[in-house]
Amino acid sequence: MMGIVFKLVLLILMLCPLTINSSFQYLTFVQQWPKGYCTANPSRCQRNPLPTVFTIHGLWPGNFTKILQNCRTTSYTKLKNFQDWNNRNLRWPDLAKPSPTMQNFRELRFQSFWEHEWKKHGTCSENMYPEATYFSRTIQLSQRHNILNYLAMGNIRPGSNPTVSSVNSTIYRAISNHVPDLMCVTPPRQTPALVEIGICFTATMTTIIDCPSQFLRTGSCGIGTINFPA
């Protein structure tokens, strides 16, 4: 009898870390501005030509008490069909890599960005969104939320120098009066450059919510004018 109890306790202890690590309450959908990325990371900017739209950085599960990362050890499944690779690459390119060819796209270096996002973030929602679903649903969010169009509603366009408050309020209105997450990088002796904009959703991805104030990166943009590089 004691042996059975011991085995049950051991099983519970083994399963608990998975349950805790996978307990996410919301999702942050993060899109990046390619010119902003390259302004912040000039030595890493390898994609040519650069996309002229906001592209996906990732979909990041979290809860309201801590940031969730690397929740499980589930491996990434490489795409082997070029059309599948290209469809994902159109909205989720790796700006730190040149475009591959039909001959070498299967090499992990051309899928390492997706592998990183899956292992670091995707595994934290794996109990609800297995790998294929995680990537497809993230791309669907990109199709529904065009950040350039949202910014244009406030007459904010690439090449302009808006205030951080105007960018924040424009996105706020575009997503039904919910708080977004902005991220800027300030090059030496320059104005902060807009790099990323995040929109937060319920765990089911059905409803936009305020991005939690305790994890906002908007402070990286300062309080004045920012650069929206063209």
Identify what each model region corresponds to.
Residues I4-S22:
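Cleavable N-terminal signal peptides of Sec/SRP-targeted secreted and luminal proteins
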Residues K7, T55, G219:
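Functionally constrained cores in energy, signaling, and assembly domains
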Residues L95-A230:
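C-terminal, well-folded lobe of enzymatic/effector domains
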Residues P17-T101, R106:
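Betabetaalpha-Me/HNH-type nuclease active-site subdomain
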Residues L8-V9, N63, S125, T206:
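A broad, structure-centric signal for solvent-exposed, well-ordered loop/edge residues
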